[in-house]
From Swiss-Prot:
Stretch forming the signal peptide: 1-22
Identification of the protein by name: Flagellar P-ring protein
Subcellular location(s) of the protein: Periplasm; Bacterial flagellum basal body
Gene name, Swiss-Prot/TrEMBL: flgI
Domain of life where this protein originates: Bacteria
Organism: Bordetella parapertussis (strain 12822 / ATCC BAA-587 / NCTC 13253)
Length: 368
């Protein structure tokens, strides 16, 4: 009796440990075929306070305005030079969400494509938004919300954030729906956000525990085949239960991400380092150039003033002593060990690469 009881206690303990790190399946995977569609359009923003396009440098703005006025029954004499300052040509983009129906609204992003100084306070005129098939799926119009601010006077200017782009919340009305087919004969395919055989297998096992064996099957490290009800009206309720299942995420692959442009270093909690000795010296080159002027000592002579450049180059190398890096099995110890080196983020890039080559860094190194 004691052995089965001990096994039961151990099973419950393992189950609790797995549930502590469990996540909803909807946060780990998406349904194949359920996605958004990109829309794009060209339009005009009016009502700017003298900060619009300079039509001489952006002739397409004047041409677009002329075409729009002609559609409204207003004829502009050919060859007329309109000096406009309150109009800007813009590109309008939006994402048509899945299952969107005509009459629903979506947010749009408006970006200047000319030389307008600011879109603040402008109004986007009616702009058709097209998909990749060149069909109109939404119509955008409304007042822009620009997050930046700026002012200029006397040749000086101050600007905060970006002024040539803005958003219109619920600024586009959907005119055409995109058919979304995600279930065929009751079969749905789930795509994991990250390729991981362990997490994919855990997700399939969680579905089978809830709905019975054979309901889900992992096809590879990313895709899961799920057999749902054949009745299409029952599929939404079934998928709602599937998405809310708790799935234990498998330990992630140890990885260190290095941004060589900014010097940023990011690592996950599974990174480990082995004991190693590290020596890294800072090599700096300082170049100082000053121009010295030599003039003749005696006035009223034929001597000439000569400018001679004086360049001084100094090469300095600091540090370089061997330092011991102890074995670290968790992220906190890894951070302490690397901080003990006293290296700057830029130095840390070279140190991590060298440790990876020496086999002391137990992680994948990815440079972006």
């Amino acid at each position: 009796m004691l052995i089965p009881l001990a096994r039961a206690v151990l099973a419950l303990a393992l189950l609790g440990a797995g549930a502590a790190h469990a996540e909803r399946l909807k946060d780990l995977a998406s349904i194949q075929g359920v996605r958004g569609n990109q829309l794009i359009g060209y339009g005009l923003v009016v009502g700017l306070d003298g900060s619009g396009d300079q039509v001489r440098q952006t002739p397409f703005t004047q041409q677009s305005l002329t075409n729009m006025l002609s559609q409204l029954g207003i004829t502009v004499p050919q060859g007329s030079n309109m000096q406009l300052k309150n109009v800007a040509a813009v590109m309008v983009t939006a994402t048509l969400p899945s299952f969107a129906r005509p009459g629903q609204t979506v947010d749009v992003v408006v970006s200047s494509m000319g030389n307008a100084k600011s879109l603040r306070g402008g109004t986007l005129l009616m702009t058709p938004l097209k998909g990749a098939d060149n069909q109109v799926y939404a119509i955008a119009q409304g007042n822009l919300l620009v997050g930046g601010a700026g002012a200029s006077a006397g040749g000086s200017s101050v600007q905060i954030n970006q002024l040539n782009g803005g958003r219109i919340s619920n600024g586009a009305i959907v005119e055409r729906a995109v058919p979304t087919m995600y279930a065929q004969d009751g079969t749905v395919y789930l795509e994991m956000n990250n390729t991981d055989f362990g997490t994919t297998q855990n997700a399939a096992a969680a579905i089978n525990r809830q709905f019975g064996a054979g309901t889900a099957m992992a096809l590879d490290g990313r895709v899961i085949q799920v057999r749902g009800p054949l009745d299409p009206s029952m599929m939404p309720a079934f998928m709602s239960q599937v998405e809310n299942l708790q799935v234990a995420r498998a330990p992630a692959t140890a990885k260190v991400i290095i941004n060589a442009r900014t010097g940023s270093v990011v690592m996950n909690r599974t990174v480990m380092i082995e004991e190693a000795a590290v020596a890294h010296g800072n090599l700096s080159v300082i170049i100082n150039r000053q121009n010295q002027v030599f003039q003749p000592d005696t006035p009223f002579t034929e001597g000439q003033t000569v400018v001679v450049p004086n360049t001084q180059i100094e090469v300095r190398q600091d540090g370089g002593a061997l330092q011991r890096v102890t074995t670290s099995a968790n992220l906190a110890d890894v951070v302490k060990a690397l901080n003990a080196l006293g290296a700057t983020p830029q130095d840390l890039l070279a140190i991590l690469q060298a440790m990876k080559t020496a086999g002391a860094l137990r992680a994948d190194l990815e440079i972006i």
